């Protein structure tokens, strides 16, 4: 035997490669209340047994590597390893299965979504033995979630700050998203807020470009907010996008927003990164700023049914990292989102305790204990005819955000805002009177048109607009 391959049997170490399932597939394991649990949709390469593929996922996302190593004997693998504890078939898919993996809590740094994701999804998704892999859900135990601050303020504190109750909030993304000067941008903000909206918004890619530097935009938007508040008597806000190329620059922009006295800032949490997002969330809580979160880049990660991560996982990660709002699809607009799936992760964002419900894609019971909730934002291709459905689907604790559905009004920005506010108030009143918005919604809107010419004009311009494409991500 060559010295390079000699086995040191005398010290209990046997070199070589062995099947993952011999160590990491443990169907007899009883999960602990402190374990982080994961549900993976696994598509193995032909010839790879489900037990081996599931064990490989557990190994490569925890303590394992491709071969036995001498240093395994210097720690307790039984204490620290991930375990594939259950495998179930995927109905209608002969080549796929769900692998359930339990991770001991000590594998993860406290209060770090960055470390959590680096471990669970950082390397294993490129594993050759797998044709595809998707993380469908995570169970975050209270013993781990309590190490996070979570949202800077949460739903109830936001309502108290705004003094607005009993209805969804209304927003608008300023369009065109790129190319306006700071002064013209501020003008559009003022007109929309004066017309009745609660918020206006920077689009996700509005940062600090040559045509509109961030400081100029912040100043003109703050002026627009103050003017609209003075005229309407309502508290208004504009999501000032603080996303930047460095964390230091991001915080500098948030500091300037606070100095201007605005109520809310914004961050692109996936392109900006979880470390940056958590830092900004901590600053916002310490300084009384609300934090709006855009999910730009999410579809790169979550849209494919067989590979990547489901948005419910990204939503849970955001709740821990911190944000008071997050975009969550519309069900009825131009962006992807099936109703039951969307409402499943909306509950994961807002509620304290969510029961396991596979009919809505929720694989685990989730207890957030005292962590504040996040308000879902419905945005993307919506207009006044969608208002009854949006009110019925998302309920009061949501933001309904109309960009083109405000600024595309034939009479201008302020009438577009008026149309949306009238439509919302009509839907809320009808719901409170016991009317069924799902069945009577169009009639509610038509009745409101009789005393709102702005709404009537909006209804006429968008009466034929629909986005009727089949969704990709079904249960």
Swiss-Prot record:
Binds 1 Mg(2+) ion per subunit. Heterohexadecamer of 8 large chains and 8 small chains; disulfide-linked. The disulfide link is formed within the large subunit homodimers. The disulfide bond which can form in the large chain dimeric partners within the hexadecamer appears to be associated with oxidative stress and protein turnover. The modification N6-carboxylysine is found at residue 201. RuBisCO catalyzes two reactions: the carboxylation of D-ribulose 1,5-bisphosphate, the primary event in carbon dioxide fixation, as well as the oxidative fragmentation of the pentose substrate in the photorespiration process. Both reactions occur simultaneously and in competition at the same active site. One of its GO terms (cellular component) is chloroplast. Keywords: Acetylation, Calvin cycle, Carbon dioxide fixation, Chloroplast, Disulfide bond, Lyase, Magnesium, Metal-binding, Methylation, Monooxygenase, Oxidoreductase, Photorespiration, Photosynthesis, Plastid. It is found in: Plastid, Chloroplast. Its EC number is 4.1.1.39. The modification N-acetylproline is found at residue 3. One of its GO terms (molecular function) is magnesium ion binding. Its cofactor is Mg(2+). The basic functional RuBisCO is composed of a large chain homodimer in a 'head-to-tail' conformation. In form I RuBisCO this homodimer is arranged in a barrel-like tetramer with the small subunits forming a tetrameric 'cap' on each end of the 'barrel'. Mg(2+) binds at residues 201, 203-204. InterPro entries: RuBisCO, RuBisCo_large_chain_AS, RuBisCO_lsu_C, RuBisCO_lsu_C_sf, RuBisCO_lsu_fd_N, RuBisCO_lsu_N_sf, RuBisCO_lsuI. Its main location: plastid. The record marks 334 as: Transition state stabilizer. Residues 1-2 form a propeptide. This is Ribulose bisphosphate carboxylase large chain. Substrate binds at residues 123, 173, 177, 295, 327, 379. It catalyses: 2 (2R)-3-phosphoglycerate + 2 H(+) = D-ribulose 1,5-bisphosphate + CO2 + H2O; D-ribulose 1,5-bisphosphate + O2 = 2-phosphoglycolate + (2R)-3-phosphoglycerate + 2 H(+). It holds the Pfam family RuBisCO_large_N. The active site is at 175 (proton acceptor), 294 (proton acceptor). It comes from Pinus pinea (Italian stone pine).
């Amino acid at each position: 035997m060559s010295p390079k391959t000699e086995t040191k049997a005398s010290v209990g170490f046997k070199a070589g490669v062995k099947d993952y399932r011999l160590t990491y597939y443990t169907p007899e394991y009883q999960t602990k209340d402190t374990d982080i649990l994961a549900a993976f949709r696994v598509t193995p390469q032909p010839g790879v047994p489900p037990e081996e593929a599931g064990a490989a996922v557990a190994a490569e996302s925890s303590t394992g590597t491709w071969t036995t190593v001498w240093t395994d004997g210097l720690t307790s693998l039984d204490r620290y390893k991930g375990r594939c504890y259950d495998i179930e078939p995927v109905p209608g898919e002969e080549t796929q299965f769900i692998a359930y993996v339990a991770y001991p809590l000590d594998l993860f740094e406290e209060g770090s979504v960055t470390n959590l994701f680096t471990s669970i999804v950082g390397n294993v998704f490129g594993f050759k033995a797998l044709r595809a892999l998707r993380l469908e859900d995570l169970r975050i135990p209270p013993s781990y979630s309590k190490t996070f601050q979570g949202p800077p303020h949460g739903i109830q504190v936001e309502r108290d700050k705004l003094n607005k109750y009993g209805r969804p909030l209304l927003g608008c993304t300023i369009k065109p998203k790129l190319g306006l000067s700071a002064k013209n941008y501020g003008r559009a903000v003022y007109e929309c807020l004066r017309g009745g909206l609660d918020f206006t918004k920077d689009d996700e890619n509005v940062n600090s470009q040559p045509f509109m530097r961030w400081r100029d935009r912040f100043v003109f938007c703050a002026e627009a907010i103050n003017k609209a508040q003075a005229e309407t008597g309502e508290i208004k806000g504009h999501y000032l996008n603080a996303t930047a190329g460095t964390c230091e620059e991001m915080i500098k922009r948030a500091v300037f927003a606070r100095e201007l006295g605005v109520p809310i800032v914004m961050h692109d949490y996936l392109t900006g990164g979880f470390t940056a997002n958590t830092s900004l969330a901590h600053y916002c809580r310490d300084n009384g700023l609300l934090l709006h979160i855009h999910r730009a880049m999410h579809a790169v990660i979550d849209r494919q049914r067989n590979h990547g991560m489901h948005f419910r996982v990204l939503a849970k990660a955001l709740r821990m990292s911190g944000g008071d709002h997050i975009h969550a699809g519309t069900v009825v607009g131009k962006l992807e989102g099936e109703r039951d799936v969307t409402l499943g992760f909306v509950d994961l964002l807002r509620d304290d305790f969510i029961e396991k419900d596979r009919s809505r894609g929720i694989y685990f019971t989730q207890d957030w204990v005292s962590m504040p909730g996040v308000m879902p934002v419905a945005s993307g291709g919506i207009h006044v005819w969608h208002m009854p459905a949006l009110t019925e689907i998302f309920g009061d604790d949501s933001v309904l955000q109309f960009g083109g559905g405000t600024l595309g009004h034939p009479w201008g920005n302020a009438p577009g805002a008026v149309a949306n506010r009238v439509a919302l108030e009509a839907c809320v009143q009808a719901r409170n009177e016991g009317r069924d918005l799902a069945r009577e919604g169009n009639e509610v809107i038509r009745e409101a048109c009789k005393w709102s010419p702005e709404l009537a004009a909006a209804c006429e311009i968008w009466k034929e607009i629909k986005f009727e494409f089949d969704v990709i991500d079904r249960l």
